[in-house]
């Protein structure tokens, strides 16, 4: 665990979540960490992890071992309802948005949020120039 913490940027080590440093959060038992989370996330984790969430955690632990060997690993997942835990910090997780996998670099500030929050499912609408018969305003445009 110590080796992995040394690979993180120094400003991440100063980060505090509800008064605890990242190192303290990693050493903390899961049931004690769950008590620090907001109600919605706390209830979700107390009900237990789904099979898909357990598989994702297993993939994340394997990816972290590969990171220690110097390999860059991106974990792909469809599990948007997984809560970001301290052990995920520093990894890149590609979250599926319904069309493609959006890479999300996990930072300490993301702890306690859902993965799906960082992979929007809808694009923002960008309206183009109105053409003929596009809107009512084109009724008064002279045809060529």
From Swiss-Prot:
Superkingdom: Archaea
Entries under InterPro entries matching the protein: Ribosomal_uS19, Ribosomal_uS19_CS, Ribosomal_uS19_euk/arc, Ribosomal_uS19_SF
BP terms from Gene Ontology: ribosomal small subunit assembly; translation
GO molecular-function terms, A-Z: rRNA binding; structural constituent of ribosome
UniProt keyword Ribonucleoprotein present: yes
Keyword Membrane found: no
Keywords for this protein: Ribonucleoprotein, Ribosomal protein, RNA-binding, rRNA-binding
Entry GO CC: cytosolic small ribosomal subunit
Described function: Protein S19 forms a complex with S13 that binds strongly to the 16S ribosomal RNA.
NCBIfam families: PRK04038.1 (NF003121), uS19_arch (TIGR01025)
Family: Belongs to the universal ribosomal protein uS19 family.
Protein name: Small ribosomal subunit protein uS19
Organism placement in taxonomy: Archaea, Thermoproteota, Thermoprotei, Desulfurococcales, Pyrodictiaceae
Gene of this entry: rps19
